[in-house]
């Protein structure tokens, strides 16, 4: 390792381009904007009769999910396939890790099979970072969610959703509501919104579900949902992550819905053109009313669509020396 290697962020290569994608912390507005611009270009691929481009032909992407997932795992698979990569999805319950093999040894064996990229989801915060520190130099690592720490591709698909529906971030008020304490999505969203210039970021929830140190994110904290929703442009609802909770944080789900559930009446306190988002899975009647989740202001299904494009952008940028945007343009020109 050279002195420059020691100083350079693990996520970036010598040219300041993506090498791994582990967290949004410390990434520049320019790089985040490039990811969004590239994802915008890939949205067009999803409208084609043949939804494929050859950018990662001959490359192998391994999805290694140690936590259950539907949207994230499936959209990463679709993203890699649309880029023409070969995709391996490791079923952890039937893999050698269930027989006592360590995560490190499992990944070393997959590396020996010439995998080019790992998409990792793990219950432990920092797991993806640990793996990125120990893989071969030519292998990329993408964080598909690690503990409470980060979910960077979810953060970016949320930003793409906001940008496509609101045009930008400079004049927006965004409210993030619910279980902030256990949410890696909330952390990634707050980092991205701040980096992209959103002037008013609000977090709303009971004191027992708000972490210490929120001031470092430049947010305003509300404990009253009605007050916090006043005149916001974007509402991001979060589910109660009861699997990560210890007892005593909430009196009941019913009480939580009474105080912090998003109903049609409560949504009326936001701007008339406000959009409603949710990373899923939705708990109807716990954090959000069905009439809101399925209503005209909901863009929840759009988030899923945009997630494929964002993950295509991240996969291609992390595995490429040039911008994916430039590659996509070149590929399109060759077809003309």
Curated annotation (Swiss-Prot):
Gene Ontology CC terms, in alphabetical order: cytosol
Keyword Transferase: yes
GO terms, biological process: 'de novo' pyrimidine nucleobase biosynthetic process; 'de novo' UMP biosynthetic process; amino acid metabolic process
Pathway field: Pyrimidine metabolism; UMP biosynthesis via de novo pathway; (S)-dihydroorotate from bicarbonate: step 2/3
Residues that, per the record, bind L-aspartate: 99, 184, 239
Reactions catalysed according to its record: carbamoyl phosphate + L-aspartate = N-carbamoyl-L-aspartate + phosphate + H(+)
E.C. no: 2.1.3.2
Coiled-coil regions, chain positions: none
Physiological role: Catalyzes the condensation of carbamoyl phosphate and aspartate to form carbamoyl aspartate and inorganic phosphate, the committed step in the de novo pyrimidine nucleotide biosynthesis pathway.
Family: Belongs to the aspartate/ornithine carbamoyltransferase superfamily. ATCase family.
Name recorded for this polypeptide: Aspartate carbamoyltransferase catalytic subunit
Protein species of origin: Azotobacter vinelandii (strain DJ / ATCC BAA-1303)
Gene designation: pyrB
């Amino acid at each position: 390792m050279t002195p420059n290697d020691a100083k350079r962020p693990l996520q970036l290569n010598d040219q300041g381009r993506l090498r791994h994608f582990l967290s949004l912390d410390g990434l520049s507005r320019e790089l985040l904007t490039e990811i969004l611009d590239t994802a915008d270009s890939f949205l067009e691929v999803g409208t084609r009769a043949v939804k494929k481009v050859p950018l990662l032909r001959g490359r192998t992407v391994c999805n290694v999910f140690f936590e259950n997932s539907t949207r994230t795992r499936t959209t990463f698979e679709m993203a890699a396939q649309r880029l023409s990569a070969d995709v391996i999805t490791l079923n952890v319950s039937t893999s050698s890790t269930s027989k006592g093999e360590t995560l490190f040894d499992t990944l070393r064996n997959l590396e020996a099979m010439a995998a080019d990229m790992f998409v990792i989801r793990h219950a432990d915060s920092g797991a993806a970072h640990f793996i990125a520190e120990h893989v071969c130099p030519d292998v990329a690592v993408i964080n598909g969610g690690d503990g409470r720490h980060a979910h960077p591709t979810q953060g970016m698909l949320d930003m793409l959703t906001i940008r496509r529906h609101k045009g930008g971030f400079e004049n927006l008020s965004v409210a993030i509501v619910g279980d902030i304490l256990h949410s890696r999505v909330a952390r990634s969203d707050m980092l991205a919104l701040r980096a992209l210039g959103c002037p008013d970021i609000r977090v709303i929830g009971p004191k027992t579900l708000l972490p210490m140190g929120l001031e470092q994110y430049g947010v305003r904290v509300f404990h009253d949902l009605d007050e916090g929703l006043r005149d916001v442009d974007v509402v991001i609802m979060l589910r109660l992550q009861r699997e990560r909770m210890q007892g005593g944080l909430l009196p009941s789900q019913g009480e939580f819905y009474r105080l912090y559930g998003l109903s049609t009446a409560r949504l009326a306190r936001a701007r008339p053109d406000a959009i409603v988002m949710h990373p899923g899975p939705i708990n109807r009647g716990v954090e959000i009313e069905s009439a809101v989740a399925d209503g005209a202001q909901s863009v929840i299904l759009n988030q899923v669509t945009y997630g494929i494009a964002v993950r295509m952008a991240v996969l291609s940028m992390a595995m490429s020396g040039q911008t994916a945007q430039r590659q996509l343009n070149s590929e399109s020109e060759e077809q003309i």
